[in-house]
Amino acid sequence: MTEVERILDQCRRAFEGNAWHGPALLELLSDVKSEDAAAHPIAAVHSIWEIVLHIAAWKNACKRRLEGDRAQLTDTEDWPIVKQTTSEKWQDAKDSLLKNHQQLLEAISRLDEWRLDTPVIEGMSSVYITLQGVVQHDLYHAGQIAILKKALGPA
């Protein structure tokens, strides 16, 4: 297995499932309803919905960086505001997250091994560190989502 294949495996485990640590991001989101996703059960903490939009934005930014774009997020892009909390809009948010994840995996799969040690873009961390950061980011926010689900109470 190449290093790129190992990175892809870790990205999939953290996001899709079969992760060593417990439920992956998609597994945690599978039973979340729109009203729960929009709720703020813990004061001064982002909602599940806001976290999903945030993760989607960063997956897209990392994909763009792999493609040579300097992709910087504004505060609004980093933490988008949820304006409509319908079940359709919640599904759109989850679909966007999945699409951005799949597009990032496609970009990673096209990488040559030698690129892993080069800066993702000039003046930034290496491609390898960036991609490990994607996995870490998914796991960090998966933990937040798990805690928010517990704070919401029984489903």
Question: Model-found features: residue ranges?
Answer:
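Acidic/histidine-rich alpha-helical segments that form the ligand environment
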Residues: 82-118, 129-134
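Short, contiguous alpha-helical
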Residues: 2-22, 26-29, 34-80, 119-155
